[in-house]
């Protein structure tokens, strides 16, 4: 079975994961920046981007090691491409494209909002009609069944 690598750097968490067969999350490594931004009362985009630079490679390495997967078994690299903080997204997308090129596999850009929706269906992918709302984004989507 082949694996997909996922990278997320859209705001203040740096994350990497390996997924098998589309739904089975084999490993997930996350570094949060909550303490880093606490004194400012919110996320500072420049600080977030620089923190991603420091933490992304260790998160990718940890996800691969925890999964016990050889890089040759990874068949695609997916990464959040938006919406999000531009500098933070650039860190993730640059790393993901570099890995895809190095490993000779496709790069897959992922919409951050749709990824939240898909995550809700990892255990029960039946009805995919959903609305996602938060204080700064709203989106209504209907995702076709993968079955």
What are these regions (language model features)?
Residues 3-132:
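Short acidic/glycine-rich loops and adjacent helix/strand connectors
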Residues 1-2, 129, 133-147:
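Single conserved hydrophobic/aromatic residue that forms the stacking wall/gate
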């Amino acid at each position: 079975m082949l694996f997909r690598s996922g990278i997320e750097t859209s705001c203040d968490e740096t994350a990497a994961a390996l997924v098998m067969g589309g739904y089975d999350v084999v490993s997930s490594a996350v570094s949060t920046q909550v303490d880093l931004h606490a004194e400012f009362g919110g996320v500072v985009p420049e600080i977030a981007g620089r923190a991603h630079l420091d933490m992304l490679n260790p998160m990718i390495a940890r996800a691969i090691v925890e999964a016990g997967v050889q890089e040759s078994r990874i068949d695609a690299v997916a990464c959040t491409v938006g919406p999000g903080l531009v500098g933070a997204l650039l860190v993730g997308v640059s790393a993901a494209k570099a890995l895809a090129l190095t490993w000779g596999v496709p790069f897959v850009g992922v919409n951050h909002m749709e990824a939240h929706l898909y995550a809700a269906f990892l255990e029960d992918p039946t009805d995919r009609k959903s609305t996602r709302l938060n204080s700064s984004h709203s989106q209504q989507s209907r995702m076709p069944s993968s079955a």
